[in-house]
Amino acid sequence: MNKTNFHTHNYRCEHAIGNVEDYVKVAIKEGYTELGISDHAPMPEYYENNRMKEEDLDRYLKEIEEAQEKYGDKIKIYKSLEIEYFPEFLEKYDKYRKKLDYLVLGLHAFRKPGDNTNYNAWKIKTGEDVLDYAKYMAEAIESGKFDYIAHPDLYVINYRNWDESCEKAAHIISEAAEKMDVPLEVNANGIRKSFERHPDWDRYMYPYKEFWEIVKQYNVRTIIGSDAHDFNRMEDREMEIAREFAREIGLNVIESIF
């Protein structure tokens, strides 16, 4: 098995620590063969906090290029960004993609039909919210702008009762991923958050078992993502738990998106 990770942050998003080289050094130490750096993309129009500033982007990409040059004989390093989906920004995604090796969809906000309000996925409270989130994610996937779907089961993070809406949502997302042949991520950071915030819970905030049992019914590739916000925890017990979680369900896990 080759160790890889394509979901990695750094200090520029203002809620992670470490620079690009810090993560690269850990990846090499842990025997990784590939590492994707994918910090939160600048979106000055929305959600200015918790993501890099527009003026930081060129330096961010340059830092990755410097790491590629310095460590390229030891590990393959890729340039990426994790970004929200807003249909009015399709040209922005194309602009970013020209500078990147791949683009990650991380859907933390969603919209309802006929409503341009940006709703927070962490505040999903109703079955209608769940379905709206899933339909919006499917729209994003089918836009063809994204190469990797981070934490697709995020909609259950605070909606704890798996019900018919959750099941339908999982089918909607899985169908879109299968149609576009885009991998869905089993996210290790959801396991970290579970242990830190809800140690008494009998399941993870995400990955959510019932969601992934539905994914398994489709011809969908899956990938394990660390979603590392701390280079000291990029390869930790939660990453191994995520790998075992995928093995137990029998998911079609890929090691690389290339």
Give the label of every model feature segment.
Residues M1-P87, K92-R97, N158-K168, I172, ...:
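An N-terminally biased module of ancient metal coordination in phosphate/nucleic-acid-related enzymes
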Residues E30-I37, L100-L107, G144-K145:
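Short coil-to-beta-strand
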Residues L35-I37, L103, I149, L184, ...:
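Hydrophobic residues within beta-strands of alpha/beta enzymes
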Residues S80-K123:
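Hydrophobic alpha-helical segments and helix pairs
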Residues D101-Y102, A177-V182, A246-I254:
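Structural alpha-beta junctions
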Residues V104-F110, N116-Y218, A228:
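Domain-core and long-helix interface of multi-subunit machines
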Residues H198, R203-Y208, E213, Y218-F258:
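Long, positively charged, glycine-interspersed low-complexity recognition regions
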